[in-house]
């Protein structure tokens, strides 16, 4: 232990190991696969790739399953929470993520994670950044990520907004 100190690391898969079971759960009518706890671990684990992994699994099942998974990751949770998002339509929040299907197919999630130093927290963090899978990100109608490069305004000006409970129809007295 003295020789390794904080460089000692090991890998353990403690859930979702069986691909068949995981696929069944991702597509089960009583699950909401777009929700994960990736934002809960900012100081140690920051994978944020649960949705990309779900799309990759769907892709292995065929194009129809990709369409179903996009629906399950976007429109379905928006409807569940009663918010005007999750669809590309007039008046909806215009946040889009453009994914390269060839890069997604080639991506091996177990080989793209690495450590970065988080000066804000004074520690290292494990991140999973799949190069070239996410081609573009558009928030509030503004391009913020284009082929691996943040826009000049990213982090300096607001692009979109957080959807809060007050946006729910119940909170607005509409239900």
State where each predicted segment sits.
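Active-site microenvironment of metallo-dependent hydrolases
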Residues: 1-175
């Amino acid at each position: 232990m003295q020789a390794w100190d904080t460089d000692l690391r090991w890998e353990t898969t403690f859930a979702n190991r069986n691909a068949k079971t995981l696929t069944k759960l991702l597509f089960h009518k009583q699950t909401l696969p777009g929700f994960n706890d990736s934002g809960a671990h900012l100081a140690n684990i920051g994978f944020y790739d649960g949705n990309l992994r779900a799309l990759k699994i769907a892709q292995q099942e065929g194009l129809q399953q990709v369409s179903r998974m996009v629906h399950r990751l976007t429109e379905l949770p928006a409807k569940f929470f009663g918010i005007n998002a999750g669809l590309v339509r007039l008046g909806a929040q215009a946040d889009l993520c453009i994914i390269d299907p060839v890069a997604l197919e080639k991506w091996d999630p177990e080989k793209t994670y690495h450590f970065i130093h988080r000066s804000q927290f004074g520690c290292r963090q494990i991140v999973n950044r799949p190069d070239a899978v996410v081609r573009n990100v558009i928030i509030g109608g503004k391009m913020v990520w284009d082929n691996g490069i943040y826009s000049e305004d990213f982090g300096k000006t607001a692009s979109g907004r957080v959807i809060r409970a007050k946006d729910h129809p119940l909170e607005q007295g509409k239900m």
